[in-house]
């Protein structure tokens, strides 16, 4: 099993830099932080040194379990968590799914914030109890000891889809993320219900399963580029996949939005840079609220079981103002 020294050597950084990343401190550059987090995941690092410290500070340490599907999104949430905790006398420990139960169940942290679609509900339910509250982002769990901060995905997706249909778009493809995640299910439900409401038909051959990563969007973009007839629009369950699909389309001389419109969800920094039509999720605020919820639960306050955040549609340049014609065949 890798140690902190192995991570530092592989990343080409100092031991203190790795320690700062593990503990959620903000004095590390974005690229360096992402590189260290990737190595932590790949090398299955369990922070033993941190674990020894936690045994003496168990009532002042918050665990943050993250997924590496989208680090841009994760970092904004983490900033919100850290900003709330830094003045509350709590330390922050970051870990991945592989080692999280160890820190949840061995008195090595006082509470946990979970942001990992791959972590199963039963793992959360095994650990949550009266003395160990958990706040889950983007999911709900049947336990009085698990609070949730979720995004109201459905109405936002309905609003965006109705706007796109009103602009003349009729034939759609949908690229899902992790199918079992609450976010993905609600985004797809908003997509399909709006299509049905408008009397349109969605062909299941145009339903693709991704994993929220840019690479899966790129793969689907390449597949669609080989099709004889493009759909009018590709609706993606997050921005990373939309960005990957756009890259594949451009490599195959398919114009966005003239030949195919593309949309995302989250409004990460890169989405703003390329003018991606998407739905803005206030990630910083989600992290801040999750930390607030957890600390209040630890202090014995009566906290609502679920807090719902409303996102906003951002129509940008990857969707035409008015769809006037359908491209019938791709010319290579």
Go through each PLM region and give its residues.
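N-terminal helix-turn-helix DNA-binding module of bacterial transcription factors
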Residues: 1-58, 73, 189, 323, ...
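Alpha-helical recognition/docking segments in bacterial nutrient-uptake
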Residues: 2, 57-162, 166, 226
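Alpha-helical structural signal in soluble globular domains
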Residues: 39, 80-84, 126, 186-198, ...
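Periplasmic-binding protein-like
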Residues: 63, 109-115, 173-175, 207, ...
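Hinge/beta->alpha junction and helix N-cap segments in small-molecule ligand-binding domains
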Residues: 66-76, 96-100, 149-159, 175-220, ...
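Flexible loop/turn connectors
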Residues: 222-332
């Amino acid at each position: 099993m890798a140690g902190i020294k192995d991570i530092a050597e592989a990343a080409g950084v100092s031991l203190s830099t790795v320690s700062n990343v593990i503990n959620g401190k903000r004095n590390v550059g974005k690229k360096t932080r992402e590189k260290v987090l990737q190595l932590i995941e790949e090398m299955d690092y369990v922070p033993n040194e941190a674990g020894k410290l936690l045994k003496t500070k168990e009532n002042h340490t918050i665990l943050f379990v993250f997924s590496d599907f989208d680090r841009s999104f994760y970092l904004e949430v983490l900033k919100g968590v850290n900003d709330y905790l830094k003045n509350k006398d709590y330390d922050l420990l970051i870990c991945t799914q592989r080692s999280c139960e160890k820190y949840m169940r061995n008195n090595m942290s006082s509470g946990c914030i979970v942001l990992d679609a791959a972590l199963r509900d039963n793992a959360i339910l095994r650990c949550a109890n009266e003395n160990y509250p958990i706040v889950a982002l983007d999911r709900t769990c049947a336990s009085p000891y698990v609070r949730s901060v979720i995004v109201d995905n459905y109405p936002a997706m309905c609003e965006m889809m109705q706007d796109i249909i009103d602009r003349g778009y009729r034939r759609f493809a949908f690229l899902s993320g992790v199918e079992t995640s609450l976010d993905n299910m609600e985004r797809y439900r908003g997509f399909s219900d709006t299509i049905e409401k408008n009397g349109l038909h969605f062909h299941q051959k145009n339903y693709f399963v991704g994993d929220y990563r840019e690479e899966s969007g790129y793969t689907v973009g390449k597949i669609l580029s080989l099709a004889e007839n493009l759909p009018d629009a590709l609706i993606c369950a997050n921005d990373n996949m939309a960005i990957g699909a756009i890259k594949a389309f451009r490599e195959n001389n398919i114009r966005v939005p003239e030949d195919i419109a593309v949309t995302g969800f989250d409004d990460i920094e890169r989405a703003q840079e390329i003018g991606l039509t998407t739905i803005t999720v206030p990630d910083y605020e989600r992290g801040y609220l999750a930390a607030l919820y957890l600390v209040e639960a630890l202090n014995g306050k009566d906290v609502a079981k679920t807090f719902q955040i409303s996102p906003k549609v951002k129509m940008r340049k990857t969707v035409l103002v008015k769809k006037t014609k359908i491209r019938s065949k791709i010319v290579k």
